[in-house]
């Protein structure tokens, strides 16, 4: 299994629709102002956060249970940025839609710009033949409110190509998050 380069990522996105919309370079500015970078890097792709968020709230004082998740635990928010309360988290989704090839697995890591501010981005791997918008989780580990930005980089996806094709892909086993289009809550 080997990590894939910018050249491979560009080819797969442009010829096979692996990432849509796709940015072949690294974008660091928008209208003359600095932003958190996104687009193709040497051995990965920096994804962007869309302007739709679900911010965790404890208003209903319920137990957080992944098997019986209460949708009232979140407040929906749309905007260019989102404030995450202290020691809380928010869900978002990517701007980009992904179609992962059958012989590829991705690992997604948070960007250091956010990590250095105490904001941790958590995303699970994108499995072979998974497709959809990625649901992102932003944890604010600080005792202060923290801001995240829509339309800017938030995490980096690394692509690994296997030496052999898997017997059963995410699509084959009917994965529960296949084809997700919005911020998707836990499914048991």
From Swiss-Prot:
Gene: dcd
Pathway: Pyrimidine metabolism; dUMP biosynthesis; dUMP from dCTP (dUTP route): step 1/2
Enzyme Commission designation: 3.5.4.13
Positions of the catalytic residues: 137
Keyword vocabulary terms for this entry: Hydrolase, Nucleotide metabolism, Nucleotide-binding
Quaternary structure and partners: Homotrimer.
Protein family according to the UniProt entry: Belongs to the dCTP deaminase family.
One GO biological process term: nucleobase-containing small molecule interconversion
Purpose: Catalyzes the deamination of dCTP to dUTP.
Residues the entry annotates as binding dCTP: 111-116, 135-137, 156, 170, 180
Catalytic activity annotation: dCTP + H2O + H(+) = dUTP + NH4(+)
GO molecular function: dCTP deaminase activity; nucleotide binding
InterPro entries to which the protein is assigned, alphabetical: dCTP_deaminase, dUTPase-like_sf, dUTPase_trimeric
Name of the protein: dCTP deaminase
Xref: NCBIfam families: dCTP_deam
Family matches, as PANTHER family: DCTP DEAMINASE
């Amino acid at each position: 299994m080997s990590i894939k380069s910018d050249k491979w990522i560009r080819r797969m996105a442009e010829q096979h629709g692996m990432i849509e919309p796709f940015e072949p370079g690294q974008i660091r500015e928008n209208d003359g102002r600095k932003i958190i970078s996104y687009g193709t890097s040497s051995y990965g792709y920096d994804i962007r956060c869309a302007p739709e968020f679900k911010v965790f709230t404890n208003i209903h004082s319920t137990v957080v249970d992944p098997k019986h998740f209460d949708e009232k635990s979140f407040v929906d928010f749309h905007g260019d940025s989102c404030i995450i309360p202290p020691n809380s988290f928010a869900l978002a989704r990517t701007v980009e839609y992904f179609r992962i090839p059958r012989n590829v697995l991705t690992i997604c890591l948070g960007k250091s710009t956010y990590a250095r501010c105490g904001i941790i981005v958590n995303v699970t791997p994108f499995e072979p033949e998974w497709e959809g918008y990625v649901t992102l989780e932003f944890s604010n580990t600080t005792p202060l409110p923290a801001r995240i930005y829509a339309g800017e980089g938030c995490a980096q996806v690394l692509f690994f190509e296997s030496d052999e094709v898997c017997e059963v892909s995410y699509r084959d086993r009917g994965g529960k998050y296949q084809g997700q289009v919005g911020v998707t809550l836990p499914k048991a």
